[in-house]
């Protein structure tokens, strides 16, 4: 442990009086201001329903008021009128009503989002906005054909994958949370992490891009120009207009889709924490131990030397030793990777998934998703320190990064040596009772099972953080170059802030790798890729076949976070400027930063982001907007933010 991090472990400077052991251990286990609460509903006849009831709604509309609060708690509204249609046919009637009365409809599910694509923070109860909750009733799932599924857009991804599994089917990749709606995933081009491993051929029904690209047919609420009324219309994937609806950002309303899937392929998921970031994210051609800097700031040393020695033993058991050491190496071998690099630490949590038909002897067999209980249910020490951070102890971020790293290492590998050699405060936080609890469920470093059990691993009970998000489009041979450039700059920027006594990141960097949206994956002749997908290929750069997804996580309200995110975003735009690689934003997360806020830079919103989906020629940004406007000319499905973006 470095001298600076040792000091941090006893008394963290930068907060009034420092963060003493007594203050920390006396803190509430709750997350305080970071906690996300599901607000109750208020019916139209309740005395608490202050806003006038929307006039003239279609008969039988299930109506109530509810606060909209998103995943991170950054978007919170007044009580807004909300309805829950029981059938898809109710939605066109609601759209007709909204048009006639000057209201707008916003589809809503489990609110697992960051960007203001549904509603803006602070939307008042008097706003003429009607939330349409699809998650109550529009949840039907049924078999359409042997390799397709018909699913209503309010169904959860967990329910969808469970249905597919019961039929022996699966997806190659999908978002990690299970409690998110299918409609929400499609709206933003949700993805997982997967590219073909060396020698792997895409099986029928599978794809390496977004979930949206697996759609073969969709039903949307559109205006019928002949009658002037809204109606349900089904678009086959072969129809040109369908490409605008596959990723629509909330500018449309889908009631159901038909998705293609393939025969399920069991996966083996191996976790390891024995490769330092300087090797995992090394520049191409760098020798072992060289790469993206030599340290990660205060706290980097805690898992350092020991992590390398003991992790090497673990790595030998799990296929390490003389095996892959860089991210690109693991991608080449397994095709499916995720790196979680806790702030101010040196050893990322690397997960790799490999297609493995039969259970390996050393693997733990699992038959349900969410197999990382230490991550799903926040351990008490992590909750304590998180509570301290969000109430002002921002300088404890290096300590928090170390704590998260140690919790993951103990729970995954059973190795407590780093805990025993850590500072007094960390040893006190990770008491014998806590360690016993972490180890009680068995080690989780090597899992095997049906794909859905290993693709979904984020519960709503995990830490609620905010995140930025970007996709770097690059040729696969340049994957390691792009990752190493990012890692070096991120480390440099974080260290510069720390040198000034600022700690803008207290979560982690997450890195995933996917393919692009090849419409052949849908199995529909004449299909086009989703026009607004960050994974839409560029016609002029056919060699760009890979996307690297980058997220930086932190608690909302962290001082300097937006300024840090802006500096990082501007660097990404300069570095991946279309010459060797390109950059697109991840719609659901943070982007277009000013020094004060996300989704606020007028140049990014008005020029840079649209141009990223215009570049390369062919149908793209402008065609998508034209199609969506043509099918909803009254902009019933929209909000002021989308009005400014999609123009």
Short names for language-model regions:
Residues 11-32:
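N-terminal secretory signal peptides and thylakoid transit peptides that target proteins
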Residues 17, 38-76:
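C-terminal segment of N-terminal export signals and the immediately downstream linker at the start
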Residues 73-173:
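Glycine-rich N-terminal segment of FAD-binding domains in flavoprotein oxidoreductases
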Residues 104-106, 168-176, 227-233, 267-268, ...:
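Short secondary-structure capping/junction motifs at helix and strand boundaries
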Residues 115-138, 192-225, 253-257:
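Structural signature of FAD isoalloxazine-binding scaffolds in flavoprotein oxidoreductases
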Residues 122-124, 434-647:
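Conserved glycine-rich FAD pyrophosphate-binding loop
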Residues 215-507, 512-513:
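C-terminal substrate-binding/cap subdomain adjacent to the FAD-binding core in PCMH-type
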């Amino acid at each position: 442990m470095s001298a600076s991090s040792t000091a941090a472990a006893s008394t963290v400077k930068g907060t009034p009086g420092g963060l003493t052991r007594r203050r920390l251990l006396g803190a509430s286990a709750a997350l305080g201001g970071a906690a996300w609460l599901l607000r109750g509903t208020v019916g139209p006849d309740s005395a608490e329903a202050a806003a006038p009831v929307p006039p003239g709604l279609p008969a039988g509309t299930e109506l109530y008021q509810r606060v909209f609060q998103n995943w991170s708690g950054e978007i919170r509204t007044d009580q807004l009128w909300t309805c829950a249609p029981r059938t898809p046919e109710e939605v066109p009637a609601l759209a007709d009503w909204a048009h006639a009365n000057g209201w707008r409809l916003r589809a809503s599910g489990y609110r697992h989002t960051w960007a203001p694509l549904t509603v803006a923070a602070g939307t008042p109860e008097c706003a003429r906005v009607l939330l349409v909750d699809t998650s109550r009733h529009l949840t039907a799932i049924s078999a359409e054909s042997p390799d397709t599924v018909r699913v209503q857009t309010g169904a959860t991804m967990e329910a969808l994958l469970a249905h597919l599994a019961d039929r022996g089917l699966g997806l190659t990749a999908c978002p990690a949370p299970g409690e998110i709606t299918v409609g929400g995933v499609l709206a933003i081009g949700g993805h997982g992490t997967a590219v073909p491993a060396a020698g792997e051929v895409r099986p029928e029904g599978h794809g390496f891009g977004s979930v949206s690209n697996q759609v073969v047919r969709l039903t949307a609420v559109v205006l019928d120009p002949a009658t002037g009324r809204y109606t349900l219309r089904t678009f086959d994937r072969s129809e040109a207009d369908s490409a605008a609806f596959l990723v629509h950002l909330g500018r449309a309303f889908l009631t159901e889709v038909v998705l293609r899937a393939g025969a399920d392929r069991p996966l083996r998921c191996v976790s390891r924490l024995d490769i330092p970031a300087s090797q995992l994210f090394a520049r191409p051609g760098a020798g072992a131990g060289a790469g993206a800097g030599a340290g990660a700031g205060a706290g980097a040393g805690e898992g350092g030397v020991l992590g390398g020695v003991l992790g090497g033993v673990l790595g030998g058991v799990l296929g390490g030793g003389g095996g892959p050491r860089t991210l690109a190496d693991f991608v080449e071998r397994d095709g499916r990777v995720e790196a979680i690099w806790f702030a101010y630490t040196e050893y990322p949590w690397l997960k790799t998934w490999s297609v493995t038909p039969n259970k390996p002897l050393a693997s733990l067999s699992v038959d349900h998703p969410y197999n990382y209980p230490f991550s799903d249910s926040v351990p008490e020490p992590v909750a304590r320190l998180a509570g301290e951070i969000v109430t002002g102890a921002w300088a404890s971020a290096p300590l928090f990064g170390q704590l998260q790293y140690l919790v993951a290492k103990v729970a995954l590998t059973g190795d407590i040596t780093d805990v025993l050699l850590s500072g007094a405060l960390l040893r006190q936080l990770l008491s014998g009772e806590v360690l016993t609890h972490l180890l009680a469920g068995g080690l989780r470093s090597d899992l095997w099972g049906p794909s859905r059990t290993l693709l979904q691993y984020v519960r709503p009970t995990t830490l609620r953080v905010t995140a930025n998000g970007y996709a770097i489009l690059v040729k696969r041979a340049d994957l390691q170059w792009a990752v190493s450039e990012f890692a070096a700059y991120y480390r440099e920027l974080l260290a510069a802030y720390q040198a000034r006594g600022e700690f803008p990141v207290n979560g982690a960097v997450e890195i995933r790798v996917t393919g692009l949206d090849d419409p052949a994956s849908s199995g529909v002749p004449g299909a086009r890729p989703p026009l607004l997908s960050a994974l839409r290929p560029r016609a002029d750069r056919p060699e760009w076949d890979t996307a690297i997804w980058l997220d930086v996580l932190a608690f909302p309200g962290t001082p300097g976070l937006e300024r840090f995110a802006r500096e990082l975003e501007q660097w990404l735009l300069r570095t991946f400027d279309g010459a060797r690689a390109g950059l697109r934003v991840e719609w659901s997360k943070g982007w277009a930063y000013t020094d004060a806020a996300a989704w606020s830079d007028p140049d990014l919103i008005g020029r840079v982001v649209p141009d990223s989906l215009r570049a390369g020629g062919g149908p793209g940004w402008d065609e998508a907007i034209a199609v969506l406007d043509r099918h909803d000319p009254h902009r019933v499905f929209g909000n002021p933010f989308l009005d400014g973006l999609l123009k």
